[in-house]
Amino acid sequence: CLCLVSALTGCYSEDKAWSAKRGDDTAAIGVYIYYLSSAYSEALGKVEDASKPVFDQEIDGKDGTQWIKDRAKESIQLMYYVDQRFEDLGLSLSDDDQSQISSLTSNVWSYSSSQMNQYGIAKTSLEKAYSEFIVKYQKVFQAMYGKGGEKEVSDDDIRTFYEDTYTDFEYFTCSYTKTDEDGKSQDMTDDEKAKAKTEFEAYATKVQDGDLTMKKAAEEYQKSIDSDTSTYQSQTVDLETNGSYYPDEFVEKLKSMKEGEVAYVDLPDSNKFYVIQKNSISKKCDEVLADDSQRLNVIATMKNEENSNDMEEAAKKLDDITFNDSAINSYDPKMFYKDSDLVSSESSSTASE
């Protein structure tokens, strides 16, 4: 019987079941494997030559393999540091927090369980390394940078950042094409374009004069062409970082407009007519400051990099974590490698230009 038990359990060892310990907490080996996988994915975006395996290159002056291993251990340090800050700040997980943790875990597990099981990452390890970490990290951030926190960001600072960074606008469009009775797309005739141009110029005038809102004008246009799809959009965007999602002429026009101004714009390169309204960014900021969730999102944009750097540096100073080096060293990052991870040399050189 002892021989049978030994044979059945020969591949399992309590000594290899855990990756790190701190105080009364023990992180399963799956936590380390998860972070090793994440570090490998991060490394793919850091190497100079994406057409070659990361293991054959250096990252930040380190051998690629060693960088990945070190990064995984640093992630465990950060996980424990977040736990420490969470405790120091007197925070706790509410029922809603627990539900969010369960939801995050289930969502990821639903599409990646097969791969994670293959690597040896249990669902409980995913929950600890990913879901619980995210929720605790966010609560620590909010406690530090939110109202009453030790690094509280004032409304004045938020307003200065927000109004200097974002542009609030609305628009709706008319394509140069139309749909025939068979559902096929056809180009407008010159006469049809001229008619659409006149209509859109009229909409711009009505909105500017206060006779219509942008949304109402878009609804009237949608009804006039018997369409089930609205082209109306209301957005607040950092045009310096996300302007590439819009036609260049659109961005240029928007930047040149005054707040409250409404304009008809013909963009032949986009094959569309536009009606655009540039709104008051100050009024939009008032809405943000009055909503705790939106306010925190802006603070995250302002302070996320600073907070991330501070947390990682502080985490490296933790000296009471015990790593199970014999277990950790038995996992090679090459286990995650796939041929599809490599980018062709032509694509790589094009992306770097």
Regions found by a protein language model. Name each.
Residues 1-3:
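Sec-dependent N-terminal signal peptides
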Residues 6-10:
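C-terminal motif of bacterial Sec signal peptides marking the signal peptidase cleavage site
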Residues 13-123:
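N-terminal targeting/tethering segments
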Residues 17-23, 62-73, 82-92, 122-127, ...:
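Second-shell loop/turn segments in exported
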Residues 30, 34, 70, 74, ...:
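Solvent-exposed, polar/charged alpha-helical surfaces in well-ordered, non-transmembrane soluble domains
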Residues 198-248:
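Peptidyl-prolyl cis-trans isomerase
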